[in-house]
Design a protein with these regions (language model features):
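Extended, compositionally biased alpha-helical segments that mediate assembly or anchoring
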Residues: 311-326
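Primarily the internal scaffold of c-type cytochrome electron-transfer domains
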Residues: 1-125, 129-302
Length: 326
């Protein structure tokens, strides 16, 4: 669970950074995070977790060291170059054999490319707006969608009616989703066509550029999709990113068609029926029965132990659990 000490100094209650990965990422970029303004800190405390990251197994022996891949910059392309330069991949795709990167949740990075960040608006301004109670003004620590309290988040700056503000956000989401669905169809076809090429005897040399294209196109898709709220935070950047992914995916499929032709296939690649989740799982060979059993075992054994440890820890806290209750 997230507590006060994750974001606040225990003595002064000033905002503070407690995650080494964020401090180290700033240092590698030649920046001193201790010089950040209070307004910047109202977003940086969020950036301790709501970011893209990976675990480096080579920094400390026997451990997976948390790293933010910002050495080249905050954009998807700059992080892609970082991963390419160190030849990092999270997994190899079972169909295409492409070395894939799994985006985490680059919320802070996509926020930086949006209009609100450009205007100096922080994460807390919208997600933790000021409220008053008992004659005191303080930030709302119910961190959720600003649409739950439009009057104290959006309408501090915007004068439109509540419903119009909400609908404008939904319209952006719908438009981004249109592009996302087009890209997803192209990515699936690229993976299937790559598998067909391998099955027909394609060589590593023939597939090298193709696998890079699949990797880059899907990274952009995953980056856009995993950045929860990105269609609001930065709709133009997310649309641009998926547009470049569509171009890369199509160019990759064009290269694939040439390879397939060289291998003797001059017709459309047979496409599987993946119209349902179950059919897609079956096509890629997921052992769903085994996975369901493993999840049930996890819920029966691991989760109760977590809850037990949490209860033991909280029982030792010297606090009045009824403080503030009516």
């Amino acid at each position: 669970p997230i507590g006060c000490a994750d974001c606040h100094d225990a003595e002064t209650m000033n905002l503070t950074i407690t995650r080494p990965a964020l401090i180290e990422a700033y240092e590698r970029m030649g920046k001193d995070i201790t010089q950040a303004s209070h307004q910047e800190m109202r977003s940086l405390v969020c950036a301790q977790c709501h970011v893209e990251y990976y675990f480096d197994k080579n920094i400390e022996e026997g451990s997976q060291y948390l790293v933010f891949p910002w050495d080249n910059g905050f954009t998807a392309e700059e992080m892609e170059k970082y991963y390419d330069d160190i030849e990092f991949s999270d997994w190899t795709h079972a169909l295409s054999r492409a070395p894939m990167i799994k985006a985490q949740h680059p919320g802070y990075e996509t926020y930086l490319t949006g209009i609100h960040a450009n205007r100096g608006v922080s994460c807390a301004d919208c997600h933790m707006p000021y409220i008053s109670e008992g004659g005191q003004k303080f930030t709302n620590h119910k961190m959720t969608s600003p649409l739950e309290y439009v009057s104290s988040s959006c309408q501090v700056c915007h004068r439109e009616e509540t419903e119009e503000l909400i609908q404008s956000i939904y319209r952006n989401q719908d438009r981004v989703m249109e592009t996302r669905l087009i890209l997803e169809r192209l990515l699936v076809r690229a993976h299937v066509e790559a598998k067909t090429a391998w099955d027909l005897g394609a060589t590593e040399e023939q597939m090298e550029e193709i696998l890079v294209g699949i990797r880059h196109a899907q990274w952009r898709w995953d980056y856009a999709v995993a950045a929860h709220g990105a269609s609001f935070h930065s709709p133009l950047e997310i649309s641009r990113l998926m547009g470049t992914a569509i171009a890369i995916a199509q160019e990759t499929r064009l290269n694939l068609s040439r390879v397939l032709s060289e291998l003797g296939l001059n017709e459309e690649v047979p496409y599987p029926d993946i119209s349902t989740k179950e059919k897609a799982q079956e096509f890629i060979g997921l052992p769903m029965e085994q996975m369901h059993e493993e999840k049930e075992e996890f819920l029966k054994t691991v989760v109760p132990r977590w809850e037990e440890i949490a209860a033991e820890r909280e029982a030792a806290w010297d606090v009045d659990v009824n403080m503030g209750s009516e």
